[in-house]
């Protein structure tokens, strides 16, 4: 492999390609003369679109093939949406860089309604996320919620075809693809607490590849990396996956980190919420502490029920 070239493994979806191109542009900006090549791959999560992610193995399905590509020497790094990255990294891989977070919020998208509360009785809502389903059903138990898979363009097309009254997507994905005008309302964390890592991109590479780690290091955004340490530590304590409705969102409040988290049942009937504040230097400890508090207050039982 030439020292002046990097190959980025990426999924083929428009959003994944945008994210990889964004990282490629940043790498070229920091390293003039560096050749950056995209290596598109199809993952199992992209191929199986007729089932909910929670039924076929979770978000790790979107990254395993990319990791295999790095192991086999076909790529040097991979770019991921951090909300898709499991809390436990596989042996032999590192996550050295987290780029500056875009917006972390969920977006309510509808052609006829401005907000969730405006949907008619028994309205049809589409989402691919148990976390979003849980919080929407808690607010509107009457809604019919169905699994909505596929890339952003596919999901919008299903809404436009009348299959749903509204859908909920990540605001960052819509914005990155130029679909800001489709957002009826950005949902504040108080209404729809984001997924762990939502809105941030991460770079994964082989743990032993010092060359790649040095080249990507300038792209790391320390403040975002610290916040995600808190969120991911909470998720690690909960041993969360996308089979479980878990949300976690950290932000800065003065000189402290404010971390909010929740664990719920898919039907929204049970939700355990919690929050902690503490020193920035203790980000991981704060996340671990909040995870423990949620477990003690009922999350352990919810998680056990979902595992059965």
Swiss-Prot record:
Name the Enzyme Commission number(s) assigned to this protein.
2.5.1.61
Question: Which cofactor is recorded for it?
Answer: dipyrromethane
> Which GO annotations describe the biological process of this protein?
protoporphyrinogen IX biosynthetic process
Keyword Transferase (UniProt) = yes
Q: S-(dipyrrolylmethanemethyl)cysteine occurs at which residues?
A: 242
Which pathway is this protein engaged in?
Porphyrin-containing compound metabolism; protoporphyrin-IX biosynthesis; coproporphyrinogen-III from 5-aminolevulinate: step 2/4
Q: Which InterPro entries does the record cross-reference, listed alphabetically?
A: HemC (IPR000860), Porphobilin_deaminase_cofac_BS (IPR022419), Porphobilin_deaminase_N (IPR022417), Porphobilinogen_deaminase_C (IPR022418), Porphobilinogen_deaminase_C_sf (IPR036803)
One cellular component (GO) term of this entry:
cytoplasm
Q: What's one GO MF term for it?
A: hydroxymethylbilane synthase activity
Query: Which HAMAP family does the entry mention?
Result: Porphobil_deam (MF_00260)
**PANTHER family xrefs:** PORPHOBILINOGEN DEAMINASE
**Record protein name field:** Porphobilinogen deaminase
- Give the species this sequence originates from: Alkalilimnicola ehrlichii (strain ATCC BAA-1101 / DSM 17681 / MLHE-1)
């Amino acid at each position: 492999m030439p020292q002046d070239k990097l190959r980025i493994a990426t999924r083929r979806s428009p959003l994944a390609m945008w994210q990889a191109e964004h990282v490629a542009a940043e790498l070229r900006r920091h390293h003039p003369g560096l050749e950056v090549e995209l290596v598109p791959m199809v993952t199992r999560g992209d191929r199986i679109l007729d089932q909910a992610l929670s039924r076929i193995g979770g978000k790790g399905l979107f990254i395993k093939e990319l990791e295999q590509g790095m192991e086999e020497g076909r790529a040097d790094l991979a770019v991921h949406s951090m909300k898709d990255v499991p809390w436990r990294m596989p042996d032999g891989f590192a996550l050295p860089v987290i780029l500056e977070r875009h917006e972390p919020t969920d977006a309510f998208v509808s052609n006829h309604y401005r907000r969730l509360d405006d949907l008619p009785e028994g309205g049809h809502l589409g989402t691919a996320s148990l976390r979003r389903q849980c919080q929407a059903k808690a607010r509107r138990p009457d809604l019919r919620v169905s699994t909505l898979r596929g890339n952003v363009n596919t999901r919008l097309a299903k809404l436009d075809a009348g299959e749903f009254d509204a859908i909920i997507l990540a605001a960052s994905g819509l914005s990155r693809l130029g679909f800001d005008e489709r957002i009826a309302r950005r949902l504040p964390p108080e209404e729809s607490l984001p997924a762990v890592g939502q809105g941030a991109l991460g770079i994964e590479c082989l743990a032993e590849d010092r060359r790649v780690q040095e080249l990507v290091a300038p792209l790391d955004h320390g403040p975002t990396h610290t916040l995600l340490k808190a969120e991911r530590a909470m998720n690690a304590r909960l041993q969360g996956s996308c089979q479980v409705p878990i949300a976690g969102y950290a932000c800065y409040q003065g000189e402290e980190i404010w971390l909010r988290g929740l664990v719920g049942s898919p039907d929204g009937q049970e939700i355990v919420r919690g929050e902690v504040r503490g020193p920035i230097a203790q980000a991981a400890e704060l996340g671990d502490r909040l995870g423990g508090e949620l477990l003690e207050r009922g999350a352990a039982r919810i998680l056990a029920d979902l595992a059965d």
